[in-house]
Amino acid sequence: MYETNELALNFALKSHPGRIRPLNEDAVGADPGIGLFILADGLGGYNAGEVASTMTVSMLLTDLGAQLARANGGVDTFDPTDALRNALVAMNSAIFRAALNSAAYEGMATTVVIAWFLGGRLWVAHAGDSRLYRLRDGQLEQITRDHSFSQELVDAGMVSAEEARVLPAKNLVTKALGATPDLEPEVHDYDVQPGDVVLMCSDGLTEMVSHLEIGGLITGCGYDVVESARRLIDLANEAGGRDNTSVILVRVAAPESQSDSTVEQAQADPDLAAQEEIPVLQLRDPVVH
């Protein structure tokens, strides 16, 4: 458990390559000391997707932490919206330039979703179809809106949300880091209540597991973030595991509550019989997997 800016956070991070793909192009990371959590999904079909996602998580943790440090931790005067926008614009340019300068990285890009618990509020930034949900009072709500072709069709009333799930172009994103030279970041902030659970995930989860199943599993686990993270990954793999699957779960707890926090990165394992357990983290420093 970490306490940051009046919030006590219990969290778990887990990533798995799935049953089909030998390479995990997802990346997850956190700086729990400042309440910062980041998930990225290197876009399938592009070169060096794993480079783009890992680069994104690592550099954003460093950049955002440095921006907050320069403000001397002055949460009251620090503007997280500007910090997130500036960091994402710089990250987009860095990936785009790297792709231009190396044939090995040509066309690489990544989605990203960021949750930053700061000053008693939650700031959310994203690009692409990696999502952030909030579970409050037993109700799971999708907070982010996918930047995708299928979502645009849903918004236009041309297809239903269920029909969009089976479209041939369902994985075509309309915004991603490194895909174009310019990026208009999407950043919003939300209130936070004790007991809230925030779920961040790559599309490897949402393509395999329904909205109702996700909410039911977390509540069925008694809002235990570590157990929920493990079981969500297992559920995606049991449903076929066609893509890499990553989840970050953060529960806002009372300051005096006690809970472990963990990061797990499983290796490719079709029968799910063996998963590598990563020890409980008790560090303030950023962690990337």
Predicted regions and their residues:
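PP2C/PPM-type serine/threonine phosphatase catalytic domain
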Residues: 1-289
